Amino acid sequence: MPRSKPYHHGNLRECLLAAGVEMIAEAGPSGFNLREVARRAGVSHNAPYRHFRDKEELLAEVAAQGFRELNAAMLEDAATESTPLGKLKRAGYAYVAFALRRPEHFAAMFDAPALDTNPACNQAGAEAFATLVGFITLCQQEGQMPEGETEGKTLFAWSLVHGIAKLAVTNRLPFRSPDRILQFAISAIDSSIKSLRDAN
């Protein structure tokens, strides 16, 4: 079983977060506790409270990390395309790829309880959603998608890629290969975008 290395002076917070990610990988957000995080980090059981009020705050920071990385991945992948629809497709692809690459963060982002009361986590999540809204808006402005109901169209697109990502990380798809999952995601994204373009 991999374990976090004992922390060095000045990086306790990062070490605790890394240990928290380990725990989520093994037991999920519901099996998370600060005492075990401290043990894995090689510090006293009181040490985590120097940086986090409780386990929910540490979980929220893991989730916020995930939302920030997801947002950056969507923007980076979208930048490889020149058309609004191409950018939207790549953002959707990046969403599923992120979940495959960071399943522990994905679990913290969407399965951990009581994160909606954490301002940093809420802000990071809102910024990621705003990125998707921006791509839908750009498609509408450039005439590649009907105008109106921007938020509804964004929720539709998000629901699709989130559903694929969730099925993938919980091994509910009939295939497990990351390449096959991403191929399926691309096909599903193409179909969903066609339906959005054809909507009146």
Feature-to-residue mapping (PLM):
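Amphipathic C-terminal alpha-helical segment
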Residues: 138, 158-176, 191-200
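Hydrophobic alpha-helical connector segments
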Residues: 61, 75-105, 154-157
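Helix-turn-helix
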Residues: 15, 19, 23-57, 61
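Amphipathic alpha-helical segments used for helix-helix packing
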Residues: 100-116, 166-174
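Amphipathic alpha-helical linker/stalk segments
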Residues: 64-88, 123-124, 137-138
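Generic hydrophobic, amphipathic alpha-helix propensity
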Residues: 12-21, 37, 62-66, 70, ...
